[in-house]
Amino acid sequence: FFQAEDGIRDVAVTGVQTCALPILELLKSVSFKSLVANCPHCFNTIKNEYPALGGDYEVIHHAELLTHLVKNGRLRPGFNYKGTVTYHDPCYLGRHNRIILEPRTVLAAIPGVTQVEMGRCREKGFCCGAGGARMWLEENIGKRVNMERTEEALGTGADIVSTACPFCMIMLDDAVKANGKGDEVSVMDISQVVEKSLG
């Protein structure tokens, strides 16, 4: 068992190195202070795996950047939005990197927004179904993961399901539409909700 696991790990490490090295070369060719990622998967890889390959950068997720801008008064959501938002914690943002309060802080800064939590949220959040390349898998047994998660989101009564991951957005949006709620409920990145609040 351990030999097989080590062999799989070796293949995975080789694959990461093959993909990462051209990106590391590109990053070395430009000058920057911080790298901002909107994808939690990319954020996690560059922040936590690239240092072992020689890529040690300050990496922040756009939820952290938006929180910083709101707290420092450089971003002032002003449009009074009357609506309810539930936030879906992406796995690689919430559970893996503990970025949990930041997206909620951004949403709380928008006048008129009422936040409601799903039953499984924050550190105990539930996957959208895209992880592990399941986004491209047609599940034949049981309920699709994105359908289960979206039903939980719809059960909150929110008119916006917000997240901070492009993969989660696709999975949740597909399931909202499959549930026949596409005209009633929007799926939006937190940055889109902020943009909407700017008038």
Show where each model-derived region lies:
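Single conserved hydrophobic/aromatic residue that forms the stacking wall/gate
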Residues: 1-19
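Iron-sulfur cluster-binding electron-transfer modules in prokaryotic oxidoreductases
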Residues: 17-199
